[in-house]
Amino acid sequence: LREHPEDAVQRQWDIMNHNATAARKLVQRVGSLPPERRMVRLGSEMLQGYTEANWIKWWQQPEIQRHCENIFAPVGEMARRLDVKVSFHPGQFCVLSSVTEDIRKRSIEEFEYHADMARWMGFGKSFQDGCKINVHISGKLGPQGILDALPKLSPEARNLITIENDEMGWGLDASLELEKHLALVMDIHHHWIRDEEYIEANDDRVKRVIDSWRGQRPSMHYSYSR
């Protein structure tokens, strides 16, 4: 960036335009699948360096923000037209329940980056309106850490956040402590690994997870071991 700033900026323009176009094509492809399979996870690397110190000011320029809205809006429009649920999953370093204040602050910034993309697509105006931003509880503060973070998030981020049970850390029972505050995502494989239990469809906990979506179509994950 310091040695070739013009080349770096042009590369950013090229990458953001390419990734937005690719996302629209991906949503279009998923929209051709059977209704129960119409969910797509978009990558966190769509906009390079969005929360990185050297690039934050560049990304926050009004003209850049307007351009992002223009290129992401068609992605959301197509998702709604084809009834495709959009999903983001911030990486492992997004730890809203960390005991370290600086990590919590940077985690909120990272979460809001995903909320910005969802907002440009037209999502986040109401609770779980077609896009989710999914994280694990992760940090040592546990469910209470998530509750403490919620008021610090933008309205769109609060509408779209989901919490998924982890296979090593905070499990399904911890997630259920948040069922009245946000939507929950149950990963069957994570639960099987952590709790050594295959959860049945008629289990009351499954109903509670579904009810946390407040009438919206819920999402469920079935991960696999690496």
Language-model features: where?
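Alpha/beta catalytic barrel-like cores
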Residues: 1-85, 94-108, 116, 121-127, ...
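Eukaryote-skewed repeat-based solenoidal scaffolds used as protein-protein interaction platforms
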Residues: 104-184, 189
